[in-house]
């Protein structure tokens, strides 16, 4: 599943579709515009009225079979991505509805707990080591930071990074900042409370993150990704912002 970066998502979908229609409901009026293979069929025009409180936009399109060999949508891929988006934007309600005759189904995603519920969902088949999901939120240098985490009885770390709701499978500076903050804060606490003797080495980051499930979500105005597929974040300010927010709130 791809995500936008330069504001060209709708233009790309339009160019790759046999046709695309946009219907807008605003201030009691309904407007429409249609495109075919990227070309405007008619300018935006008013086509009727709607309820005064109805507002929003409907975008309908048909993938171009001359471009794509396969035009059948995979419901499960869409379901996973839309669930992610609902977790990452607390309070947002997303309805996924399949109206194809041979596969009719529907799912609704709505999570008031946001990424806390995301961690709970990821840990549902595991035994949590403590009941509370640790949550940190803040902003620094124009970077909004949200982090939720909880350890479980497994031996594997599962830390997932998101930038403007886009998954970064290879991590990046936001994940580096999170791990730095976690390692430093745990070791400072252990030293201060005499859990580590003066002659003992610090706890390693790998040991601290064993069995950890975490979501690290940042919102940043000008994200810099390594590669077009957005696998990894490169903004240095994201590292500092996540480190600052997590360190301060864990202390």
Residue ranges and their predicted role:
Residues 60-62, 160, 244:
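Surface-exposed beta-strand-to-loop junctions
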Residues 90, 236-251:
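Flexible helix-coil linker/hinge segments at domain or subdomain boundaries
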Residues 68, 167-170, 234, 238:
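Flexible beta-alpha connector loops of hexameric P-loop NTPases
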Residues 74-78, 174-175, 238, 242:
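Hydrophobic (often cysteine-bearing) scaffold residues that line and stabilize catalytic clefts
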Residues 1-121:
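GHKL-type ATPase core
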Residues 76, 83-85, 91, 95-231:
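GHKL/Histidine-kinase-like ATPase module
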Residues 46-47, 232-235:
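A ubiquitous short alpha-helical element
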């Amino acid at each position: 599943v791809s995500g936008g970066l330069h504001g060209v998502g709708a233009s790309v979908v339009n160019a790759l579709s046999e046709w695309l229609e946009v219907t807008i409901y605003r201030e009691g009026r309904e407007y429409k515009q249609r495109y075919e293979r990227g070309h405007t069929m008619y300018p935006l025009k008013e086509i009727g009225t709607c309820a005064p409180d109805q507002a929003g936009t409907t975008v309908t399109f048909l993938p171009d079979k001359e471009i794509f060999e396969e035009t059948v949508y995979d419901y499960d891929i869409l379901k996973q991505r839309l669930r992610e988006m609902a977790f990452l934007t607390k309070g947002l309600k997303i309805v996924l509805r399949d109206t194809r005759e041979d596969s009719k189904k529907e799912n609704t995603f709505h999570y008031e707990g946001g990424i806390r519920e995301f961690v709970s969902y990821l840990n549902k088949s595991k035994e949590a080591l403590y009941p509370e999901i640790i949550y940190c939120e803040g902003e620094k240098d124009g970077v909004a930071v949200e982090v939720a985490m909880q350890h479980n009885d497994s031996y594997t770390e599962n830390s997932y990074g998101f930038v403007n709701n886009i998954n970064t499978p290879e991590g990046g500076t936001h994940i580096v900042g999170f791990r730095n903050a976690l390692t430093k804060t745990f070791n400072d606490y252990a030293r201060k409370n005499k859990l580590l003797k003066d002659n003992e080495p610090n706890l390693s980051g790998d040991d601290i993150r064993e069995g950890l499930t975490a979501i690290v979500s940042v919102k940043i105005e000008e994200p810099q990704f390594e590669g077009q597929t957005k696998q990894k974040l490169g903004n240095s300010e994201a590292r500092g912002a996540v480190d600052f927010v997590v360190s301060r709130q864990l202390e």
